[in-house]
Swiss-Prot record:
InterPro entries: Mycoplasma_peptidase_DUF31, Peptidase_S1_PA. Pfam families: Mycop_pep_DUF31. Keywords: Membrane, Transmembrane, Transmembrane helix. The chain crosses the membrane at residues 7-27. It is a single-pass membrane protein. It is found in: Membrane. The keyword Flavoprotein does not apply. This is Uncharacterized protein UU030.
Length: 747
């Protein structure tokens, strides 16, 4: 396709996840650089300090900082009061000022800094916000310094085979952290700064003996990347350090090497997953006195001379490479040796990042809708969906199949077809003549198959990338979808799209904070506790009919299992009805908008992998911005819950589903990736992606993904708290049979 083809769409409106971008400097205008230099000494002005690396400062006491760190972690802004009383700002260069002295207040985590501005010849005393550890927080961390989660024997670890819940919740260290958090949040001194310490240890955020307490505590936690559960990073041995595959103790003639079979067994049963980092995560839970069991000795003799001091790694998840290294010390010879063994996909059960991304890629599609505002130009509304199951429908022609597709409510909501503050901006379907005119006017830019397909405008469209990028967290020209590659969803058209969704979760939420202008939406009980009934997840299930030839072309790995004994197992379904654990890594992938101006693609495949998460019971603050507008049949009976528009209703729903906030170790998902599935490192489906958090904007090392979990983790939610169970119940009630969730049982 000609590169110009990408732009014949005129307007590409990509359905985007909510992108939350916290800013460090708001309305910070720069004055001319020579204005401050030419200032008089009696010039009026003030100085403020801004922390640009809170990730670092929140790991230290203010009393431990030095001048170099102050210059590295903070910037200073001079507020110049001009003759017309307007204030202009300049970020000071390091040669504009001199730090005279500073004073720490470890009680509240602040730092007072006295700086001298050279051009004004004045000194200014300024105080930071509480961006450092307080004494109280530091004492808490010091208490934990001598506690360890490494409490298991190897035999105990083997008994927890592929059972992460028992592995984590039977650990006395984790149980103690949970107890500490419960005590802390039941006191009245909980605050957002101290709460971070507890979130980093447990990854779960709902505490309180009653609903009122849980509501209050919900606002004492920041739901961001810095509050996730922190997985301990493996100790990496420097590349230049020499390792040996075997070591002979010349005193005893014993030959020592790594116990290869034990390592392979632990890889195979690892409850955390099959990545090299997952293996290191598991070993972190093993008692140090068990380390000698990782050795193989040629002679069955005492190993009193040899001490296993520590475990190190060289790890690359991208390639499934693991070098397991024991630091051993010979007490007789005073010799230290690093004994190692290498593991990969060929000699063990290890997996690489792309194995997870490939699994997602094979089941994921781009969903695209052509709309227009003026009947002349095209908007392409794009989101991501994935195959849940196949519906058994004998009424279909042999060349068609019906699939249950999952995506976000806001992807399939299509409220832009029903409402707009300005009717001139309201989107709509093309009519036949408008689309024919559009094709004629753009004939020089579009492919022949698009030009000849005169009824394409009537259908929801779908597509996949011809090839998955070898590295899914990077954009690749091979992983794009062009406009001409889109196929039709045959049962969703401009005539029947109002009835597109088969399942929208229904939730009630108790213990909420809500704007008073939404008073007709909520109920109040005798204890003055507010609740709402029109809650949901940002999730819908839509039956879609596909042509098998399109499946063959666009989903070849799926086509291979169609109508075989392996088909039912291929479908991901809706998880396993178990609660997600924040200690498990997450993977997601979808089709955000293509950012390469030299590409003909409209969207491209991209993946994201997280390392540690935070579970938010649900968003208890209900605002106008929280509303999910869904245009379709009436979903709720609340007086303000719907509005008749044309043939359908504009339903107003709130996303009160349990959320997961991640720390994206690699990759990030932008506009168009809304609706991407989220799986854990054991290939279990746990939820759906709907928003992004630009955490790097405030100094965090990684951005975040926000998703809804399919199993609720709050006692204040009711209704479809287990999406899988709710869907199976609905399938059975409506006598709908599928390959995975509700198969026909032969009598």
């Amino acid at each position: 396709m000609n590169l110009k083809t990408k732009f014949f769409l005129k307007v590409i409106s990509v359905i985007a996840p909510i992108v939350i971008i916290p800013t460090i400097l708001a309305n910070c205008a720069h004055i001319n650089s020579n204005e401050l230099d030419n200032a008089k000494t009696n010039l009026k002005g003030s100085v403020e300090v801004v922390n640009i690396n809170p990730y670092k400062t929140k790991q230290m006491l203010a009393s431990n900082i030095n001048k170099e760190q102050i210059n590295s972690y903070f910037i200073f802004i001079f507020n110049l009061i001009k003759t017309n009383q307007k204030i202009e700002e300049k970020i000071l260069d390091k040669n504009d000022y001199e730090i005279l002295n500073w004073a720490a207040n470890d009680n509240d985590g602040t730092l007072g800094i006295n700086i001298y501005i050279k051009t004004t010849k004045q000194s200014y005393l300024i105080n930071t916000k509480p961006v450092f550890l307080t004494d109280k927080q530091n004492n808490y961390l010091q208490e934990l310094k001598y506690k360890t989660p490494a409490v298991y024997s190897i035999d105990e670890i083997l008994k927890f085979s592929n059972n992460p819940y028992n592995l984590i919740h039977n650990n006395p260290y984790y149980r103690e952290q949970l107890l500490r958090a419960k005590i802390y949040f039941n006191q009245n001194e909980a605050n957002v700064d101290d709460s971070k310490l507890y979130m980093n240890k447990i990854g779960y955020s709902e505490f309180g003996s009653d609903v009122q307490k849980r509501l209050e505590n919900a606002f004492k936690i920041r739901y961001d990347e810095q509050n996730i559960y922190q997985i301990n990073s493996p100790q990496i041995l420097a590349k230049e350090t020499k390792t040996l595959t075997s070591y002979i103790d010349k005193k005893t003639n014993n030959n020592y090497s790594i116990n290869i079979e034990l390592i392979k067994k632990l890889i195979q049963i690892n409850p955390f997953g099959k990545l090299p980092k997952n293996f290191a995560q598991l070993i972190n839970l093993i008692k140090k006195e068990e380390y000698p069991k990782f050795l193989t000795i040629t002679k069955n003799e005492s190993v009193d001379n040899i001490v296993v001091k520590d475990i190190y790694y060289r790890i690359i998840d991208r390639y499934a490479k693991l070098e397991f290294i024991l630091e051993i010390y010979n007490k007789k010879t005073k010799q230290t040796v690093y004994l190692s063994a290498n593991f990969n996909q060929k000699n063990s059960g290890l997996l690489k990042n792309e194995d997870y991304f490939q699994y997602i890629f094979d089941r994921t599609i781009s969903l695209d809708l052509l709309t227009t505002k003026d009947g002349k130009n095209v908007e392409l509304n794009s989101g991501t969906g994935w195959i849940v199951d196949r519906i058994i429908d004998d009424s279909l022609p042999k060349n068609k199949i019906k699939l249950l597709i999952a995506t976000n409510n806001h992807v399939m909501g299509w409220s832009n077809l029903a409402i707009s503050k300005d009717n001139r901006m309201k989107s709509r379907w093309f009519n036949k003549q408008e689309y024919i005119n559009y094709l004629e006017n753009n004939a020089g830019f579009i492919s022949s198959n698009i030009y000849e397909d005169k009824d394409r405008y009537q259908y929801l469209l779908w597509g996949t990338a011809p090839l998955k990028s070898p590295v899914s967290n990077k954009y690749n020209s091979l992983s794009g979808i062009s406009f001409s590659n889109l196929a039709k969803v045959y049962n969703i058209t401009n005539q029947n799209f109002i009835n597109r969704a088969w399942y929208i979760p229904q939730l009630s939420a108790n213990g909420i904070k809500i704007n008073e202008n939404l008073r007709t939406w909520y109920q109040i009980n005798q204890e003055d506790i507010k609740s709402i009934k029109n809650g949901t997840l940002d999730f819908v299930l839509v039956p879609m009919v596909f042509d098998i030839e399109d499946i063959k072309e666009k989903l070849p790995n799926y086509y291979k299992v169609l109508n075989t004994k392996d088909e039912a197992n291929w479908y991901i379904g809706l998880g396993n009805s178990k609660k997600y654990l924040p200690q498990l890594q997450l993977f997601s992938g979808g089709y955000p908008g293509d950012v390469n101006p030299n590409s003909s693609a409209i969207v491209s495949w991209r993946g994201s992998k997280s390392y540690g998460s935070l579970i938010q019971a649900f968003d208890r603050e209900i605002k106008n911005e929280s509303i999910l507008d869904y245009y379709g049949p009436k979903q709720i009976n609340n007086i303000d819950g719907y509005q008749k528009v044309g043939e359908g209703y504009l339903n107003k729903l709130f996303n009160v589903g349990t959320r997961v906030i991640t720390s994206d170790e690699i990759g990030d998902l932008g506009s168009g990736s809304s609706g991407s599935m989220i799986i854990d490192s054991n290939f279990n489906l746990v939820g759906i992606h709907f928003a992004s958090l630009n955490s790097r904007a405030y100094g965090a090392p990684n951005d975040s993904m926000i998703g809804n979990l399919f199993v609720a983790q709050s006692q204040d939610l009711s209704g479809d708290i287990d999406v899988r169970a709710a869907v199976i119940k609905k399938l059975k009630a409506e006598n709908i049979y599928t390959y995975k969730l509700n198969p026909k049982v032969s009598s």
